[in-house]
């Protein structure tokens, strides 16, 4: 995927100005406010050991999950990184004309919104952005006291053959590989550096009298699948299998199956057609290696949180910005309206409240914003559109049983076990439909949308989708 890191990598921005929408309130450690460690993991799908994928080696995430509330049905609002992050961090829904793709910016698409880090900053928190939080490093820059990103080529290759081929730092078109197995230490790749920066921040923040909102944006398992050799060695290629859903049913609209251009851009990937089985398995192997690599880096930060004595007063939120296809429906990457792209990991640890519980309640990423505000006693801005899931953390039932996600023309309503998608034009008129019942078809292989016996249900879901996608969904943003 193309990157828009238009500022020099490694840029450190220290800013003190803030939006004048709200009066700043000072909070000090004397009042014992809760800190927040906010961990974003790029392209992490919920194929993890604590989600039941026993073949994945993720001991540090497993430990965090055992101390947290684990959300089994958490959905991103947009399955592409820039838009998903901008939506989550502003707490606002995507519309027909907002949060469209990876280039989306919070400060451009939702300039009226008070972002999550800005809310914490305005209430006296030290706010730090490390690594990839927003897609664009300078997005919403006034919300942070410090913005840091590691220096170097964004593809971060270590093998000379890949470095030479990757002539353009921002384009996979340089011809380099979609994966790399290099015998290097963890700090050779960006996530090792990001972890070290987070550890240093925690050691410094321990001495501060101010509470903190520390955001850690880890880069893997995003393409290219580059990880130190020892993490590749955790998995036996011979034991890796293609997904059960390695098929594209004819009943499903062709619109649902894009050509996954993000992966096709790499030099060792065919430009069209199905991938050869051995290449598909090598990609899956690389993804798994990256998951284990980033797990180890996150573990270092969580260990530092404990060692500094901050863990008992720090909320930890870990989320993947969307799902990812590893050959599911013969698809790769995100950018689609299937469960595999819309469902993403969400784990929330609240000291004294969570201890390995699990929830099957449906949540959306925009629900994270109001929840963190309520947990820390901050007022939720009027611009935030999500619903707090604090009742779930408190052991209560959640009334909400739906989520809405969107990618370009495709808009999906998840309601209980039903998974309904429409592709619409600018007037909101559907031109393709897709309906799955996860109770009987969790693999999404039998599209019910065009079957006569389901037409009444389709009408009901179409109406409900329009009620829930937001009143401004079709409005052109003229700002």
UniProtKB/Swiss-Prot annotation:
GO molecular function: iduronate-2-sulfatase activity; metal ion binding
GO CC term (a single one): cytoplasm
EC number: 3.1.6.-
Keyword Hydrolase: yes
Keyword Calcium: yes
Protein keywords: Calcium, Cell membrane, Hydrolase, Lipoprotein, Membrane, Metal-binding, Palmitate, Signal
Cofactor: Ca(2+)
Alphabetical list of Pfam families matching this protein: Sulfatase (PF00884)
3-oxoalanine (Cys) PTM positions: 81
Post-translational modification as stated in the protein's UniProt record: The conversion to 3-oxoalanine (also known as C-formylglycine, FGly), of a serine or cysteine residue in prokaryotes and of a cysteine residue in eukaryotes, is critical for catalytic activity. This post-translational modification is severely defective in multiple sulfatase deficiency (MSD).
Enzyme class: hydrolase
Function noted in UniProt: Sulfatase involved in ulvan degradation. Ulvan is the main polysaccharide component of the Ulvales (green seaweed) cell wall. It is composed of disaccharide building blocks comprising 3-sulfated rhamnose (Rha3S) linked to D-glucuronic acid (GlcA), L-iduronic acid (IduA), or D-xylose (Xyl).
Family, per entry: Belongs to the sulfatase family.
Protein name (database record): Ulvan-active sulfatase
Lineage of the organism: Bacteria, Pseudomonadati, Bacteroidota, Flavobacteriia, Flavobacteriales
